[in-house]
Amino acid sequence: MAAVFCVYNEEEYLEVAVRAILPAVEQVILCLGLSPYTAYRAEGSLEPYPPDRTEKIVDRLAAEFPGKIQVIKGNWPSQMEHREAGLKRCLELGMDYHFLVDGDEVYREDHLRHIRKTIEQHPETGTFIIKCHTFWRSFHYRIPPEILTWRPRRIFKLTRNRRILGIPFPHKLKFLGANDLNGIGTIYEFPPAEAAFYHFSYARSADRLKEKLATFPHAHQILGGWYERVWRAWPQQREMENIHPTDPPKFPRAVRQSLDDLPPVMKTHPYYGMDIIV
């Protein structure tokens, strides 16, 4: 199994995400974008968002784990094309499973052990859904998986052939969406209590959040005034509901929870002690 990261400007969380998952997989593939996606940039937007320290982090990790970390660098217009580059390398390496991980997704060791065990017990499964805790403006606040409607597909079995009337035919694996591969087999969803990931997508500084909103695939769908009305206003209105930037009910509310369940590696992160990340 290979963990495949497709990243650009992920210096805040990439290193902890990679180190957390390294022991659970045979290979880590880091697909580093050297510039932001152009397909989602708003018309007339010339904001450059130059590279941060992500490339240095990638190079350092690859040097530290030369037999385990593969690096691909390039410029991809869209997230789909970026994903396809990672899939291609995964297939070239002869991997049986593709573990999709974004640069702000961190796993716990006990959850990863359970994931590996479950995969071994379910060879008939082609797609594994792993829900997440999505953090909001702080490590203290999150949209827990129990109220989060998103059901992210994260692990795909790489079946190269499919049988029709008992005859094997080549099956071309490809991404159908940013988080969906056309794998063959059943779908298994992990109960969040058994396995979930910690998604720090909205636990960012104001500048980083603006960059995310300008360059991610749903940039054109962001509701007008959301940044001022929701993001900036939330610290003074922490009971606010329906806070997602493109489809408000997707984030019903951010709930304050204990930090006790966080992956231990997060306890050394610079944001750990902050009530609100600024």
Predicted features along the sequence, with ranges:
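Catalytic-site signature of metal-activated, phosphate-bearing donor transferases
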Residues: Q79-E84, V106-V278
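Acidic donor-binding segment of Leloir-type glycosyltransferases
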Residues: R19-I72
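Residue-level signal for alpha-helix termini/capping positions
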Residues: A63, L91-E92, E120
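N-proximal low-complexity "stem/linker" segments adjacent to membrane-targeting elements
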Residues: M1-P23, L30
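Glycine-rich, basic loop-to-helix element that forms the pyrophosphate-binding segment
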Residues: G74-C90
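Short beta-strand-to-loop acidic/aromatic patch adjacent to the donor-nucleotide binding site
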Residues: G86, G94-R108
